Amino acid sequence: MRIRLISVGGRMPGWAAEGYREYAQRLGGGISLELVEIPLGRRGKGADPRRALDEEGRRMLKALGDEQVVALDVRGKAWDTPALARELDGWLHDGRDLALLVGGPDGLHPDCLARAERRWSLSPLTFPHMLVRVLLAEQLYRAWSLLQGHPYHRA
C-alpha cells in the first residue's frame, strides 16, 4: 500500500528531513510512505489569508487520486497507539492507497476536510507542519511494528 503524506509547506530543514526519512524507510510489509509537498499560498502584508487557503485547498484536492483520505485536524479523533494500529490494519485491508492531509498555517480548506473519510487529531496542541511530518512517519512505523509483533513498541 502506498501512503501519501500530502502536506502544505516547503522543504524540510535537515533535522526534519532526516527524521522523516528514517521512519519512512523503516516501514516494510509492502507499505511505502511518500511525501507530496503543496506550495504555501501567498501570505504576507496585505494578502488575504482566505485566498491563500483557497489556493492550498485547490492544489491539495488536485493532488488526490482514488484513495482513502484522512485529514489531520485538531477536531479529529485522537487515537492511542493500539487504536492507530487497528486503523492502519483497516487501511491495509481496504485495497486502496491512503492519503494523509496536513494543512498549512491556517489549517485545511473546508473542501479538503469534506473530502476526507476520517479526521485524525495527533494532539490538542498545535505543531509546526515540519514536525508533524516526522511525528506521522514515526507513529505509522510504530503502528506497523505493533501489527508485525516487532519489539519497537513497548508500551
UniProtKB/Swiss-Prot annotation:
Enzyme nomenclature, EC number: 2.1.1.177
Name by which UniProt lists this protein: Ribosomal RNA large subunit methyltransferase H
Superkingdom field: Bacteria
Annotated GO MF terms: rRNA (pseudouridine-N3-)-methyltransferase activity
Organism: Alkalilimnicola ehrlichii (strain ATCC BAA-1101 / DSM 17681 / MLHE-1)
Catalysis performed (reactions): pseudouridine(1915) in 23S rRNA + S-adenosyl-L-methionine = N(3)-methylpseudouridine(1915) in 23S rRNA + S-adenosyl-L-homocysteine + H(+)
Residues that, per the record, bind S-adenosyl-L-methionine: 72, 103, 122-127
Annotated function: Specifically methylates the pseudouridine at position 1915 (m3Psi1915) in 23S rRNA.
Keyword Thylakoid attached: no
Keyword Transferase included in the entry's annotation: yes
Gene: rlmH
EC class name: transferase
UniProt cross-references to InterPro entries, sorted A to Z: Alpha/beta_knot_MTases, RlmH-like, tRNA_m1G_MTases_N
Family: Belongs to the RNA methyltransferase RlmH family.
Cell location: Cytoplasm
Subunit structure, as described in the record: Homodimer.
Gene Ontology terms: cellular component: cytoplasm
